[in-house]
Structure formats: C-alpha cells, structure tokens
Amino acid sequence: MPEQKMFQPRIHTRLPDNTVIQYYDSHPINESQIMDAIKSLDLRDEPLRPHHLFAFDQDHFGGLEATRTLAQLSQMNAESAVLDVCSGVGGPSRFFADQYGCRVTGIDFTETRRKTAIKLTEMVGLSDKVTFIQSDATEMPFDNNEFDIIVAQEAWCHISDKNQLISECSRVMGTGGTLAFTDIVKHDAATDRTLERLGHEMTFQGLASINDYVSILEHHGFTIKEASDLTDEWARILVKRLEMYRGLEQKTTAVHGEARAIEWDRAYSFFVNRYQTRELGGVRIVANKST
C-alpha cells in the first residue's frame, strides 16, 4: 500500500510571527471593550461572577451555545483535564471551568490576550481552576499524555503548519482523549487571489479543507467521530457579526484609531462575503485519539 500523502498547504501569505499578534492587538473585541461592558452591568453590591461575562467574552461563531456544544460532544466533566488551544481572552476556558468544574489550561500566542484572560479570570474568582500560558501551539510546553480533552474555536486558520499543530495535540493528549474544535476552512471555489487577500487582511495561513483536516487527524492517530460542515450556519451568523462589529466602530476608533476601524470593516466585509460565494466555510470536528 502506498504511503499516505500528507496535506501540505499552499501558503499564499507566509506571515512573520508578530503579524498575527498585531492583528489581535488591534482587534475590536479587546480588554477595553470588555471592561466597558462590565461597567455597564447593574450589579449593585453583587460580586462579578463568570456568568456575568458570558454575553460578551465568548468571541466565537455561535457564541455560548457553540462553546457548550463542544463541551457536550467531548463529554467534559469535573474530572477532565482540558486544554484550550488559542484561548484568546479566555471566555470558553472560564465557561468550561464554571459549568463543568474541570481544570482548564489555555494557551495563546498573543501576550496581550493572555494578560486579559488572566485579569478577567481573577475578577470572577476562577484562577484556581483556569491557567493561561503564552505559547506557540506548534511547540507546546507540556508533557506527553497530559490532557483528556483539547478544544479550539476558529483560531487554527492562523497557523500555517497544520501537521505540526495536530502532531502536538496528539502528543499532549492521552489515548482515548477527545479533540473537539471548529475552524474556518476553504472550499474548492476559493481562488488564489482570495486566499492571498485573506492572508494579508485576516492573517489566515495555509487554510485547510474539511478533507484536509480529516486526513491530518487520521495520520496522527485520531478516529473521526464527527466532521460537520457549518458553512450555511456560519454564513448567517457572520452577517450578524459584521453588524456587531460595526456597532463597535466608535470604540474601535477610540482604542485603535480611525484608520484601523476602516481597515477592519473592509477586511471583515470581504471575509463575510466569501461565505456567500462559498469560497470559505466552517467545520466542527470531534475526534478520539485511538493510538
């Protein structure tokens, strides 16, 4: 039998490490925006709790329910050791710890996101259950077989080396563990011009197709339990997200400047429209580590 050919993405735009960091450092969803939302809560003398943040710290397609779905599909419970890969400002990590009682480690490449995640986690009293580490997802600082569950949401589109990423997930996960993630994927209609522009404007690198992900996961010892095409659902969600971001235009301008606000709107509009042309799509994959 011929050796299985590994997925090798065509990198239309290979970005320096700091480009992705800069992208998230100037993101409309940021510490300032979240702190303003907290101040607007009418808590009176009530202490800030994790659920108070759920309305605005779940920066993922489908919001809280999408995060809950990953937890349910991975059969998360109080005994689970969970790794959130590309954890951002930590909303899902806090949700998992609060709702399921598990211990969660979040890793993110962007230090400002990690610091915000730590601050918010301290504010809601979950620092004993949730830890955040600055780390490259392709070189994780963990021992072999350290986690039962690995989750991620719409972040691996920024990582060019999908093979090494999945290899690291396999290494740090114990046999029988579950990987549950969602990501932005390309469809056959995606043109080189589109992918290059998304690389420059959205810092997407080496976008995989659904079949690419399945191939990589199986190569690294995972058995696919679910690979759901979310393209149609996300096409609807993203139109609403664009409206949400436009509602933050004044705050984005105040924090990052008018030029960045205009640049973001142009880039995100183009991104959202690629779902209408079906050049881009979404996937939710659940896989068990079998070897």
Name the predicted role of every residue range.
Residues 1-39:
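N-terminal auxiliary segments of SAM/dcSAM-dependent transferases
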Residues 226-291:
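Conserved Class I S-adenosyl-L-methionine
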Residues 43-47, 60-78:
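Conserved alpha-helix/loop element of class I SAM-dependent methyltransferases that forms part
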Residues 205-221, 227:
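Short alpha-helix
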Residues 163-178:
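A short glycine-rich, Lys/Arg-flanked "PGG" loop and its adjoining helix->strand segment in the class I
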Residues 138-149:
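A short acidic, Gly/Pro-enriched loop at the edge of an enzyme's catalytic core
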Residues 184-204:
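Short, glycine-/aromatic-enriched active-site segment of Class I SAM-dependent methyltransferases
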Residues 81-139:
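Class I SAM-dependent methyltransferase SAM/SAH-binding core
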